[in-house]
Amino acid sequence: MTNLRKTHPLMKIINSSFIDLPAPSNISSWWNFGSLLGICLIVQILTGLFLAMHYTSDTMTAFSSVTHICRDVNYGWLIRYLHANGASMFFICLFLHVGRGLYYGSYMFLETWNIGVLLLFAVMATAFMGYVLPWGQMSFWGVTVITNLLSAIPYIGSDLVEWIWGGFSVDKATLTRFFAFHFILPFIIAALAGVHLLFLHETGSNNPSGLCSDADKIPFHPYYTIKDILGVLLLILVLTSLVLFSPDLLGDPDNYTPANPLNTPPHIKPEWYFLFAYAILRSIPNKLGGVLALVLSILVLAVVPFLHTSKQRSMMFRPFSQCLFWILVADLLTLTWIGGQPVEHPFIIIGQLASILYFLLILVLMPITSLFENNLLKW
């Protein structure tokens, strides 16, 4: 009798995706982040579901309902902090996953890469809407500032902002619709992740060398299932340590003050994972220019495959490109730091230089360096 997992219509899909999937024999731990992102998404959906059972999306009671979850609901504090810090873990895994794609040339799988960029936008939108829900000071002023940026769009800007707000200011209608979107988007993300995997399995995984690995494949199970379980255990260790020892480390103390439209916080800033984009936004004095730079800071990833000029796919054997890659990482860390600083000297000029360097590296320096390395191969 043939094995059920190979004949059953549903099991067959699971089998070909996670059990008998031929995988390159040399993929490193950098390939663990896809599965970790899947785990993060499951954790976020489950904790979010339990939070939604007790949360009320009304401006009068939203803040109190979050307090009620933390004080009165059984293990409500744990669910709330798992959800908040789970988002941070999600973004850490996302950034590392994208970084690995850039380093090893995984962006050459065009469909997989473009759906990944779409997923990044969707996750950022979800996280932004989720930050609004506790209805603290930073929630209120964050959503006011960021949605107001849309008014920079010529002709339709002001109408668009009022349409998103559901009125003439951020109020009950805004909170209710953001809650609705925050609830539905993770399921759309899960569907997109399925399509992401579908396209990946059409081509098979890339590997650190960037060479074709068809001649040397091993089954996904047990080799990479065990490897993924190790990654998951480490993720759980970091997340639980964060939640149980220092749950507010990555949050903003201003969000423990109920939203007050009459009192502006001294420094309005988003969560840490948006700070690099926020720094790029702030570095341009013009409103529309800032909004364009903000969108392009992520959208530039979609252009990367078309700027690949190297004869080699991976950066593994390209020392000059490696140097530029790590300069890009340092630049992003600098932007993250600048995003959390007040708008004053010397932070303004540092932010502007770091923003210019960010786009310069991706659009100009990396492609030129790749061409230079191609010529080195001829020597």
From Swiss-Prot:
- Give the GO cellular component terms, alphabetically: mitochondrial inner membrane; respiratory chain complex III
Q: Name one Pfam family in it.
A: Cytochrom_B_C
By its UniProt entry, which InterPro entries does this protein fall under? Cyt_b/b6_C, Cyt_b/b6_C_sf, Cyt_b/b6_N, Cytb/b6-like_sf, Cytochrome_b, Cytochrome_b_C_euk/bac, Cytochrome_b_N_euk/bac, Di-haem_cyt_TM
- Residues given in the record as heme b b566 binding sites: H97, H196
Q: Give the residues the record marks as binding a ubiquinone.
A: H201
Q: What membrane topology does the UniProt entry give?
A: Multi-pass membrane protein
Chief subcellular location: mitochondrion
Q: Which cofactors go with this protein?
A: heme b
**What Gene3D superfamilies does the database record attribute to this sequence?**
Cytochrome Bc1 Complex, Chain C (1.20.810.10)
Q: Which GO terms describe its biological process?
A: mitochondrial electron transport, ubiquinol to cytochrome c
User: What residues form the membrane-spanning segments?
Assistant: 33-53, 77-98, 113-133, 178-198, 226-246, 288-308, 320-340, 347-367
Residues annotated as binding heme b b562 are H83, H182
Subcellular compartments: Mitochondrion inner membrane
Q: Summarize subunit and interaction data from the UniProt record for this chain.
A: The cytochrome bc1 complex contains 11 subunits: 3 respiratory subunits (MT-CYB, CYC1 and UQCRFS1), 2 core proteins (UQCRC1 and UQCRC2) and 6 low-molecular weight proteins (UQCRH/QCR6, UQCRB/QCR7, UQCRQ/QCR8, UQCR10/QCR9, UQCR11/QCR10 and a cleavage product of UQCRFS1). This cytochrome bc1 complex then forms a dimer.
- State its role: Component of the ubiquinol-cytochrome c reductase complex (complex III or cytochrome b-c1 complex) that is part of the mitochondrial respiratory chain. The b-c1 complex mediates electron transfer from ubiquinol to cytochrome c. Contributes to the generation of a proton gradient across the mitochondrial membrane that is then used for ATP synthesis.
What name goes with this protein? Cytochrome b
Recorded source organism is Sorex jacksoni (St. Lawrence island shrew)
